[in-house]
Amino acid sequence: MLLNTPAQLSLPLYLPDDETFASFYPGENPSLLAAIQSAVHQPHGSYIYFWSREGGGRSHLLHAACAELSQQGEAVGYVPLDKRAYFIPEVLEGMEQLALVCIDNIECIAGDEQWEMAMFNLYNRIVETGRTRLLITGDRPPRQLNLGLPDLASRLDWGQIYKLQPLSDDEKLQALQLRAKLRGFELPEDVGRFLLKRLDREMRTLFMTLDQLDRASITAQRKLTIPFVKEILSL
């Protein structure tokens, strides 16, 4: 769990420094991106739920929202429920005091009575206060989460619901090139297409590989070419 909170709730917030709104390539998701940015900049509470298959950019958008408000000195919280084994449901208590609460991978608590009730209670407290922005992600629409608590499924279905559309191969190439540009180097189109052809096309894998190639090119003082990529990745 990652928090940047008032003193009484103080825990450090660690966010990937490269997962911001500026580095997010929206593809066919400009409406979702605009909705999240609007929610972040509004002074009152709001709720957005968006879903996609794993690796579709869900966490990136939550990290970006946290970073945006955290940089403004606001109190924010990010809870990755796929890692809930490392904390307990009581961590959600008091989060209605924060400016932004991001709940990632809510599908992971399906069937867990304690976590479902804790999430249900947090949702209700946030609605009552009317101040907190709430962003929740899942791997499917709220009504298909197989939650054991029907009232929680109903609450999750009340807000703005979006499907995070996957990127096409051309859009993945542009996302990689944007990532490279923000890191200060160029990814030639032929190299990008080679990576898409030879590697797992899941974006997290592609970004990790791009970072690896960036470090290797700096060390070797060479530009990214297909022969160099083959050498570094043993392809």
Swiss-Prot record:
Keywords: DNA replication, DNA replication inhibitor
GO BP terms in the entry: DNA replication initiation; negative regulation of DNA-templated DNA replication initiation
Pfam families listed in its UniProt record: Bac_DnaA (PF00308), Hda_lid (PF22688)
Signal peptide: none
Family: Belongs to the DnaA family. HdA subfamily.
Function: Mediates the interaction of DNA replication initiator protein DnaA with DNA polymerase subunit beta sliding clamp (dnaN). Stimulates hydrolysis of ATP-DnaA to ADP-DnaA, rendering DnaA inactive for reinitiation, a process called regulatory inhibition of DnaA or RIDA.
NCBIfam families: DnaA_homol_Hda (TIGR03420), PRK08084.1 (NF005982)
Complexes and interactors: The active form seems to be an ADP-bound monomer. Forms the RIDA complex (regulatory inactivation of DnaA) of ATP-DnaA, ADP-Hda and the DNA-loaded beta sliding clamp (dnaN).
Protein name as it appears in the record: DnaA regulatory inactivator Hda
Organism (species): Yersinia pestis (strain Pestoides F)
